[in-house]
Amino acid sequence: MRVLRYTACTTRHTCLNTVIFNWSLCMTVIPVTEQRNPASYQIDTKSTEEILTIINNEDKKVPYAVEGAIPELTKLIDRLVPLLKKGGRLFYIGAGTSGRLGILDASECPPTYGVSADTVQGFIAGGDDALRRSIEGAEDDENHGVEQLKSAAFSSSDMLIGITASGSAPYVLGAMKYARSLGSPVGAISCNERSKTFELADFPIFLPVGPEIITGSTRMKSGTAQKLVLNMITTTAMIKLGKVYNNFMIDLMPVNAKLEERSKRLINEITDCGQSRAAEVFGESGKKIRTAIVMASLGVDKTEAEKLLKAGGGNINFAIDAHAKHAD
C-alpha cells in the first residue's frame, strides 16, 4: 500500500488531487475509522477558527448517523426491557474511549434512576486503571473480557453490548463470543460497516460517522456517536421501566443539596401542592420522590402511599386510580 505524504504549498488544488487519488487506493483495505478525511487535509496549516469550524462541521454529521440506527436500537431496547424487568442486567464492554463511555453511562444510572449499581455495568480493557491512562495492548487480550464477565457472574439472563469504533478489538470480540455461547442476547455498536462485532451480534448498531478529522482519532465523532447511543439505550429503557413520570426522573437519588432541591421542586411541579408541602412530604417519605408524590396528591401518609404504590406495581397513576376506586 502506498504511503501518503504531502507538504503544504500554495498550489492547493494540485496537492489535494494527489492526496485524494492516494486515499482512494486505500479505501478498500482500511476501515473507515482509520481512513483520512478529505475535509481536514492540511488542517495543520489552518487558523484556530478554521480548525474549530472543520471540527464543528464534521460533528454535525453525528446525529444523522445515529438517526439511521433507531430501527435497530428499537429492537435492542425492546429485548432489553423485559430482561431487566425479570432481574437481568445490561453489560457494556469496550476498549479505550469506547470502554470509558460504557462505564460512564453505567455509573450514572444509579443516581439518575435509583437502580442498583449491578443493573448496568461497564468493563474496559485493562481494568479500572485504564479509565485514567491508556494501557497499550490491553485490547488485544481476547480472554480478559471473558474473565471480567465471569467475575460478574454474567449469565443468559443478561445482555452484553460490545462497543468498538473499528469493530475489531479482540478483547470485545472474545467477550461477545462468550456471551453468545451462554445464549445471552448480544448487541454491538460500531462505526465500521464491516465490523467483526456485527457477525456476533443479534442487534448490530452501525453508526456511519465517516473518517475522523484527525486520522484514526476515534475519540472524536465515533466517541460522540457512541455516547449519544448509550444515552438513548439506558434513558429509553428506564422510561419503559417506569423510572420516569411525564418527563421527570422520579427515582433519582437525592444525594446532595442540589438534588434535594430538585426533588422538592419536582414534587411541587407534579402535584401543585406548594413548595412548603413538597418539602414536608419529601422529608416524611424518607426522601423517596415517588412516595412523596402519592402522599401529596392524595393526602395520605407514607404507609398508605407505599401500600398503594405496591398495589399499582410502582406506577403512580395506577396507585392514584386504586385509591379512587377504593374511595368509591
Residue positions per predicted region:
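A short, well-structured juxtamembrane/interface segment
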Residues: 68-83
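Gly-rich Lys/Arg/Thr-decorated short loops/hinges at beta-loop-alpha junctions or inter-strand turns
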Residues: 56-62, 122-133, 272, 286
